[in-house]
């Protein structure tokens, strides 16, 4: 398997393109992560921030009265990497079945378009773009953050039954009987009125109190955490996803393990992050080639 992210055509100039290497190894799985796929910009480089902007994610992220905002991590890079990994695994399965290699290309820009998901399809079907909604959902209400008396909480009411349970939990059962709010389409149409009512209620108690009461009613709710909050969260600490690893330069460090569990066991961290140049000799001497 060869995975590369050079600009389109660069490795061909060095004699390391797919056509050259497949002659040496017909079973090679050759995966190129490019900036843009076939088209007028196919030779342009791509970066996460650029494709978040040009690909529409920034245009739908942020508050209506604020600036378009990038995602807090390099999400375009990461999703593209996941898609490249899935395509490579599929190619390995094909090779095991047929003995044939595969030429794969995963463009960063088109990969980002693919995770516009429901927002892309809504626009393609209706021709309408609802733009930036902050922490609200375009087609589900209430599904957003609210200000409790001490900090923000995130409420995700996914269906009408959960809305009824929410109304009982906050002491406003008649809201679920109000024709303006009884069904989700009604709540979407009357979003501003309902959100104002709920915000008034949520401001009366701290977030933790609301979370306990509303969770007990079977409604998804949780705090809006800082990183310090996240890594002191009881579930995070009990889940086994945080691991202590001995690093040759930094000593004992904490790392996040894989989220995947296999047969009930979380996958181990086999090696610490490499130091600069740690594997240069293995690569140059051909041990990895």
Language-model segments: what does each one mean?
Residues 133-138, 143-145, 155, 189, ...:
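Short Gly/Pro-enriched turn/cap motifs at secondary-structure boundaries
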């Amino acid at each position: 398997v060869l995975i590369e992210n050079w600009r389109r055509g660069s490795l061909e100039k060095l004699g390391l393109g797919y056509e050259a290497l497949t002659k040496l190894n017909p079973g090679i799985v050759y995966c190129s992560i490019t900036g843009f796929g076939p088209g007028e910009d196919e030779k342009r480089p791509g970066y996460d921030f650029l494709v978040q902007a040009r690909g529409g994610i920034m245009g739908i992220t942020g508050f209506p009265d604020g600036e378009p905002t990038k995602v807090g991590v390099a999400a375009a890079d990461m999703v593209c990497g996941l898609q490249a990994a899935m395509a490579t695994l599929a190619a390995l399965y094909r090779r095991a079945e047929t003995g044939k290699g595969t030429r794969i290309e995963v463009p960063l820009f088109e990969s980002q378009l693919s995770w516009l998901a429901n927002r892309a399809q809504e626009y393609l079907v209706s021709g309408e773009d609802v733009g930036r909604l902050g922490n609200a959902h375009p087609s589900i209400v209430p599904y957003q953050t609210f200000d409790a008396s001490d900090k923000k909480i995130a409420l995700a009411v996914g269906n009408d039954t959960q809305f009824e349970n929410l109304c009982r939990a906050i002491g406003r059962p008649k809201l679920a009987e109000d024709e303006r709010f009884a069904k989700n389409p009604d709540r979407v149409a009357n979003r501003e009125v309902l959100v104002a009512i709920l915000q008034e209620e949520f401001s009366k108690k701290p977030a933790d109190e609301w979370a306990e009461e509303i969770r007990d009613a079977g409604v998804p709710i949780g705090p809006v955490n800082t990183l310090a909050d996240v890594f002191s969260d009881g579930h995070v600490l009990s889940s086994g996803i945080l691991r202590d690893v001995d690093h040759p330069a930094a000593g004992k460090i904490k790392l996040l393990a894989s989220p995947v569990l296999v047969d009930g066991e979380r996958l181990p961290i086999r090696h610490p992050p490499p130091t600069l140049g740690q594997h240069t000799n293995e690569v140059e001497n051909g041990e990895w080639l």
